[in-house]
């Protein structure tokens, strides 16, 4: 298990407060959203995996925002298709 230092991750993000927010969002995605990790898990908890992803530059606030926007657009398109299908069947 590779050791993660907070300082390395802070250098990628800019400050500790943003690091906490980004790591928490990413850990929540993996834990409850069914998102796969971008680094080997090695029996680590989602928070540690999130910090490793940030440290390696794989996850940033911009990446998380873009992914969430894309997922929301896909969900809205699916809902619109379902509503259209229901309307056609009436």
Swiss-Prot record:
GO molecular function terms listed in the Swiss-Prot or TrEMBL record: DNA binding; DNA-directed RNA polymerase activity
Keywords: DNA-directed RNA polymerase, Nucleotidyltransferase, Transcription, Transferase
Cellular component, GO, one term: DNA-directed RNA polymerase complex
Membrane-spanning intervals of the chain: none
InterPro entries according to UniProt: DNA-dir_RNA_pol_omega, Pol_omega/Rpo6/RPB6, RPB6/omega-like_sf
Record's catalysed reaction(s): RNA(n) + a ribonucleoside 5'-triphosphate = RNA(n+1) + diphosphate
Pfam families for the chain: RNA_pol_Rpb6
Disordered: annotated segments: 69-90
Domain of life the protein comes from: Bacteria
SUPFAM superfamilies xref list: RPB6/omega subunit-like
EC numbers: 2.7.7.6
GO biological process, one term: DNA-templated transcription
Function, in words: Promotes RNA polymerase assembly. Latches the N- and C-terminal regions of the beta' subunit thereby facilitating its interaction with the beta and alpha subunits.
Subunit record text: The RNAP catalytic core consists of 2 alpha, 1 beta, 1 beta' and 1 omega subunit. When a sigma factor is associated with the core the holoenzyme is formed, which can initiate transcription.
Protein name: DNA-directed RNA polymerase subunit omega
Source organism: Vibrio vulnificus (strain YJ016)
Biological classification of the source: Bacteria, Pseudomonadati, Pseudomonadota, Gammaproteobacteria, Vibrionales
């Amino acid at each position: 298990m590779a050791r993660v230092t907070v300082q390395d991750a802070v250098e990628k993000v800019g400050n500790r407060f943003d690091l906490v927010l980004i790591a928490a969002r990413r850990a929540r995605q993996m834990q409850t959203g069914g998102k796969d990790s971008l680094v080997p898990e090695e029996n680590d908890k989602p928070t540690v995996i999130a910090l490793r992803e940030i440290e390696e530059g794989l996850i940033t606030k911009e990446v998380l925002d873009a992914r969430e926007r894309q997922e929301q657009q896909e969900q809205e398109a699916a809902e619109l298709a379902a509503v259209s299908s229901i309307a056609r069947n009436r």
